[in-house]
Structures are given as structure tokens and as C-alpha cells.
Amino acid sequence: DNTAKEKDSPANLSLRTCAAGDNAEQPLDPSRNTFDNAYYIALQRQAGVLFSDQSLFTSAR
């Protein structure tokens, strides 16, 4: 049955999973609506969420 195979194709699974497309928000910081220092503490512990943030924090420049 080709219908079942097409339904579970990688392209169709991607469309269902990523329905919002490029504009989908990812919950990288669950406390983003409140100001806290958890972001900076994580960087100090070498546990930054994004590699770019951690690199900027540890850069000597």
C-alpha cells in the first residue's frame, strides 16, 4: 500500500513535526520572560545552551 508509505515518508514526517517552519520557537530558555542570572551562571559552569554564546563568553577579546 503506497498510501501508508507516503504518509510516513521523511518529508511528510518533517512537515507534521515542523508545522511552523522556520518561524518555530524553541524553548531554549524556559525563564525568558523574567530577568534572572541563570543564563550567566550556566556560562560560568561551561554549560551554555548555544555554542556561540559559550564561545563569546570565554573569548579573551
UniProtKB/Swiss-Prot annotation:
Residues 1-32 are annotated as: Disordered. This is Peroxidase 1. It is an enzyme of class 1 (oxidoreductase). It comes from Vitis rotundifolia (Muscadine grape). The keyword Metal-binding applies. It is found in: Secreted. Pfam families: peroxidase. Glycans are attached at residue 12.
